[in-house]
């Protein structure tokens, strides 16, 4: 089918140039005008989408070419754009950065082409004048098939600096930008930005950037560019939602909230009713047939998680009854014997995995991976292949006296070397990998089937 939705991709010359801030400012301005805005984030990031969801008051969806493939990207875009007036897609890293230094696979540029979307690129223009024209010309001629329709000048010193840059840019129009305001930046920690739902991410900061954008962004020109986006063809999906067959508990609070919306959507389509609960504050769950623990910050909230003995005991009892439990990264840490912080303090957790989670100061793993199951799991049969991503500062110290079965063959995206991962015991499957279930539609169905057999 063909659809027409006004849209823009906000790319950048690299990370840290202010793509997120521009996207947030623009989202708030458009909502203030009465427009319904759908937001998207290119790549596997979980944190930026929390900001876009908060600004748009709609769930932000990830679009990742390598994890999802073209058909799933287009279908996710289509489904999220129902009853909206405009779509804003924030890129990742630099415009052409992705799977390989020699191709556009997995890049923002690839997503922009798949969506036939105009691109507005964000630059860090500190200490810059006429050079901005050279950079933009280079980006434009590097890939003539990309519709580079405009640019934003960020980290400028003053409104007059923005005007100077506009006058200098002859190849690509500069549609405004945001001046330096270091006191209004969003707070960060080891995995990046704080989640937008946390208390120290104030409404004041959101409002500030929206107001700054109103002063300096050429909104009418931006809307004109968005409206110029042509119709795109969306492959017809045959996915039908099955009648509710089981209930799956989803851990969702400040400690656990790293989920791809696509994964949750596929569980619903497979017939699962999702029951959200908080490992921080709930003492038990209503009757569930399975549990899903996503990633997050269990190390930050370790004292509170460890003190919630009622829920820990309740989940242990469910596990002893062989209820299927799937856990990723932070969820894996929660299933372990406990979390040892960098400072040395130890907090006991569920103890369902015979290992201890050790927090480190340095990054332990980052990047895309491809997984093949080498044994039957709660996802299904041997040989299932899927893709995922990892980003962590912790490691597992395994208990050699009580070995656990490893059920994943893991291959990093840029290597042929295979390693073992994926921790399985009875009806538990836990891993550091954040799996994207669009890479294999059988994962959601397999997990639901396991829940039905409990």
From Swiss-Prot:
Residues 247-442 form the GATase cobBQ-type domain. Signal peptide: none annotated. The active site is at residue 329. GO terms for molecular function: ATP binding; cobyrinic acid a,c-diamide synthase activity. The record marks 434 as: Increases nucleophilicity of active site Cys. It is an enzyme of class 6 (ligase). Its cofactor is Mg(2+). One of its GO terms (biological process) is cobalamin biosynthetic process. Pathway: Cofactor biosynthesis; adenosylcobalamin biosynthesis; cob(II)yrinate a,c-diamide from sirohydrochlorin (anaerobic route): step 10/10. Pfam families: CbiA, GATase_3. Keywords: ATP-binding, Cobalamin biosynthesis, Glutamine amidotransferase, Ligase, Magnesium, Nucleotide-binding. The keyword Ribonucleoprotein does not apply. It catalyses: cob(II)yrinate + 2 L-glutamine + 2 ATP + 2 H2O = cob(II)yrinate a,c diamide + 2 L-glutamate + 2 ADP + 2 phosphate + 2 H(+). SUPFAM superfamilies: Class I glutamine amidotransferase-like (SSF52317), P-loop containing nucleoside triphosphate hydrolases (SSF52540). Its EC number is 6.3.5.11. It comes from the Bacteria. The a and c carboxylates of cobyrinate are activated for nucleophilic attack via formation of a phosphorylated intermediate by ATP. CbiA catalyzes first the amidation of the c-carboxylate, and then that of the a-carboxylate. NCBIfam families: cobB (TIGR00379), PRK01077.1 (NF002204). Catalyzes the ATP-dependent amidation of the two carboxylate groups at positions a and c of cobyrinate, using either L-glutamine or ammonia as the nitrogen source. Belongs to the CobB/CbiA family. HAMAP family: CobB_CbiA. Comprises of two domains. The C-terminal domain contains the binding site for glutamine and catalyzes the hydrolysis of this substrate to glutamate and ammonia. The N-terminal domain is anticipated to bind ATP and cobyrinate and catalyzes the ultimate synthesis of the diamide product. The ammonia produced via the glutaminase domain is probably translocated to the adjacent domain via a molecular tunnel, where it reacts with an activated intermediate. This is Cobyrinate a,c-diamide synthase. It comes from Leptospira interrogans serogroup Icterohaemorrhagiae serovar copenhageni (strain Fiocruz L1-130).
């Amino acid at each position: 089918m063909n659809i027409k939705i006004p849209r823009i991709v906000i790319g950048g010359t690299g990370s840290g140039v202010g793509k997120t801030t521009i996207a947030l400012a623009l989202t708030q301005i458009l909502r203030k005008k009465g427009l319904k805005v759908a937001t998207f984030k290119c790549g596997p990031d979980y944190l930026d989408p929390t900001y876009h969801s908060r600004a748009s008051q709609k769930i932000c969806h990830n679009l990742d070419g390598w994890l999802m493939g073209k058909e799933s990207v287009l279908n996710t875009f289509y489904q999220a754009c129902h009853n909206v007036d405009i779509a804003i897609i924030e890129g990742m890293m630099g415009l052409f950065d992705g799977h390989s230094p020699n191709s556009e696979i997995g890049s923002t540029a690839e997503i922009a082409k798949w969506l036939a979307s105009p691109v507005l690129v964000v630059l860090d223009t500190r200490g810059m004048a006429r050079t901005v024209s050279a950079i933009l010309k280079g980006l434009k001629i590097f890939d003539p098939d990309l519709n580079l329709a405009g640019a934003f000048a960020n980290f400028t010193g003053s409104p007059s600096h923005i005007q100077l840059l506009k006058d200098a840019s002859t190849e690509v129009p500069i549609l405004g930008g945001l001046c330096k305001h270091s006191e209004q930046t969003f707070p960060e920690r080891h995995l990046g930005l704080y989640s937008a739902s946390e208390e120290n991410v104030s409404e004041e900061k959101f409002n500030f950037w929206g107001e700054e954008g109103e002063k300096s962004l050429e909104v009418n020109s931006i809307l004109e560019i968005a409206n110029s986006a042509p119709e795109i063809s969306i492959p017809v999906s045959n996915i039908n939602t099955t009648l509710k067959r089981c209930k799956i508990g989803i851990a969702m609070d400040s400690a656990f909230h790293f989920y791809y919306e696509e994964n949750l959507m596929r569980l619903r389509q497979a017939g699962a009713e999702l029951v959200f609960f908080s490992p921080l504050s709930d003492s038990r769950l209503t009757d569930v047939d399975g549990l899903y623990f996503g990633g997050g910050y269990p190390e930050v909230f370790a004292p509170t998680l460890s003190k919630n003995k009622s829920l820990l005991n309740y989940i242990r009892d469910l596990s002893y009854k062989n209820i299927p439990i799937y856990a990723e990264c932070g969820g894996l840490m929660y299933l372990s014997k406990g979390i040892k912080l960098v400072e040395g303090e130890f907090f006991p957790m569920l103890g369902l995995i015979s290992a201890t989670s050790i927090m480190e100061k340095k990054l332990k793993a980052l990047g895309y991976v491809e997984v093949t199951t080498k044994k039957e799991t709660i996802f299904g049969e041997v040989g299932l292949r899927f893709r995922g991503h990892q980003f962590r500062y912790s490691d597992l110290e395994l208990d050699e006296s009580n070995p656990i079965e490893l059920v994943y063959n893991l291959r990093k995206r840029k290597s042929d070397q295979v390693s073992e991962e994926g921790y399985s015991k009875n009806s538990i499957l836990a891993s550091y990998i954040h799996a994207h279930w669009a890479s294999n539609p059988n994962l959601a169905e397999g997990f639901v089937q396991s829940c039905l057999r409990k």
